[in-house]
Amino acid sequence: MKLTINILFCLILISQYNSANGNLRDLFNNVRGSISSSANKIRQDVKTLFHPSDKSGNKESSNIVFVEDKDEGAVGPARDNKPVAVTPAPVVSTTTQASAPTVATNGTATGGKDDKGRENFNGGCLAGYMRTADGRCKPTF
């Protein structure tokens, strides 16, 4: 860290130093001038790219002529004017037979015994469990 600060300080002192011939100062001025000129050239290129002027000599854009097509002399692909035979689609009947509704009956009889709603339980047991006769899930060993 101290070394880089010392090097920068020395470079600043050297750049300000005027030698007898001015070679060192001319070197830095030449580098700075070339960087400045290339930056100006890039700036001009970008400016002309996004904001083109009419003085740039782009005369092709002003000489655009639109020609309308005429159907009289146009040559296109030959086409037959024969009618195409169309077959009608078959008609499908959509009538349905109505049936009398039936009364749904539960297959299990309660028989006076209180099952607490287990007669309607149709769920399965988890893996590793087995259904008992009264509808509970019991672990298998």
From Swiss-Prot:
The gene is PSP1. Disulfide bonds join 125-137. Transmembrane segments: none annotated. Keywords: Cytokine, Disulfide bond, Signal. Residues 46-118 are annotated as: Disordered. Residues 83-98 have a biased composition (Low complexity). Mediates the spreading of plasmatocytes to foreign surfaces. Plasmocytes are a class of hemocytes involved in insect cellular immunity. This is Plasmatocyte-spreading peptide. The keyword Signal applies. Belongs to the GBP/PSP1/paralytic peptide family.
